[in-house]
């Protein structure tokens, strides 16, 4: 094992990286309330793992979507547990995100020089809500269908750009297969990719600037 470590150390200087990570200064005022952001990230990882597992069985079709979810819940080994964890973790992620935003705001973590960290966090909040909106409709049951219809119809009230935006979201004049395909693509590819990039940017800025001091 020592030879393997020495091989990597010679090429990547892993010890220097480990020392940099472990020696990062943590202000003495930091307490348990500063863990909300980390919990959000943990929930995101759980969402990725459980969501990926369900993609093996879920079918994004208006005909088969509900039946495939029912199959996951009743026939797939531990499918009920995986989907339940996915739902519970989604709720936990939103709740922890709200608490994280309040904590950052109340402790002044958005002030100079951390404005960009705050901006990326706000965008991440929008992405998180978008996860909920798109995922809610994927079972394509009565609740999911009407939720999708209402959500995609909201932009119609916006002058000029509203109606074209509705067409883009729905993939046509009415809610149907094209809408479900768009929601599935957004939920499983577009939003996770955006979240990963934004989280990396968010973490790098926190790493660079450190945790804000007490008020």
Curated annotation (Swiss-Prot):
Organism field: Thalassiosira pseudonana (Marine diatom)
UniProt keyword Phosphoprotein, yes or no: no
Membrane topology reported for the UniProt record: Multi-pass membrane protein
Residues annotated to bind heme b 1: 100, 202
Function summary: Component of the cytochrome b6-f complex, which mediates electron transfer between photosystem II (PSII) and photosystem I (PSI), cyclic electron flow around PSI, and state transitions.
SUPFAM superfamilies: Transmembrane di-heme cytochromes
Cofactor binding mode and count: Binds 2 heme b groups non-covalently with two histidine residues as axial ligands.
UniProt miscellaneous comment: Heme 1 (or BH or b566) is high-potential and absorbs at about 566 nm, and heme 2 (or BL or b562) is low-potential and absorbs at about 562 nm.
UniProt-recorded name of the protein: Cytochrome b6
Subunit-level organization: The 4 large subunits of the cytochrome b6-f complex are cytochrome b6, subunit IV (17 kDa polypeptide, PetD), cytochrome f and the Rieske protein, while the 4 small subunits are PetG, PetL, PetM and PetN. The complex functions as a dimer.
GO molecular function: electron transporter, transferring electrons within cytochrome b6/f complex of photosystem II activity; metal ion binding; oxidoreductase activity
Parts of the chain that traverse the membrane: 32-52, 90-110, 116-136, 186-206
Keywords on record: Chloroplast, Electron transport, Heme, Iron, Membrane, Metal-binding, Photosynthesis, Plastid, Thylakoid, Transmembrane, Transmembrane helix, Transport
Binding site for heme b 2: 86, 187
UniProt-annotated binding residues for heme c: 35
Biological processes per GO annotation: photosynthesis; respiratory electron transport chain
Subcellular location(s) per record: Plastid, Chloroplast thylakoid membrane
GO cellular component: chloroplast thylakoid membrane; membrane
Cofactor(s), by name: heme b; heme c
Family to which the UniProt record says this protein belongs: Belongs to the cytochrome b family. PetB subfamily.
């Amino acid at each position: 094992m020592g030879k393997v470590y020495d091989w990597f150390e010679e090429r990547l200087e892993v010890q220097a990286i480990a020392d940099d990570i472990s020696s990062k200064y943590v202000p003495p005022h930091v307490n348990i309330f500063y863990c909300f952001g980390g919990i959000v990230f943990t929930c995101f990882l759980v969402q990725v793992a459980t969501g990926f597992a369900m993609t093996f069985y879920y079918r994004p079709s208006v005909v088969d979507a509900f039946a495939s979810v029912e199959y996951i819940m009743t026939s797939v080994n531990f499918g009920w547990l995986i989907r339940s964890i996915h739902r519970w973790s989604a709720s936990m992620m939103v709740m922890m995100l709200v608490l994280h935003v309040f904590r950052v705001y109340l402790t002044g973590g958005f002030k100079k020089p951390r404005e960009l960290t705050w901006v990326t966090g706000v965008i991440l909040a929008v992405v998180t809500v978008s996860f909920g909106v798109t995922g809610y409709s994927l079972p394509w049951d009565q609740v999911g269908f009407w939720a999708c219809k209402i959500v995609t119809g909201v932009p119609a009230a916006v002058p000029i750009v509203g109606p074209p935006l509705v067409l883009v979201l729905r993939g046509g004049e009415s809610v149907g297969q094209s809408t479900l395909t768009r929601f599935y693509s957004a939920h499983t590819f577009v939003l996770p990719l955006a979240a990963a990039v934004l989280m990396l940017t968010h973490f790098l800025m926190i790493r660079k600037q450190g945790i804000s001091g007490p008020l």
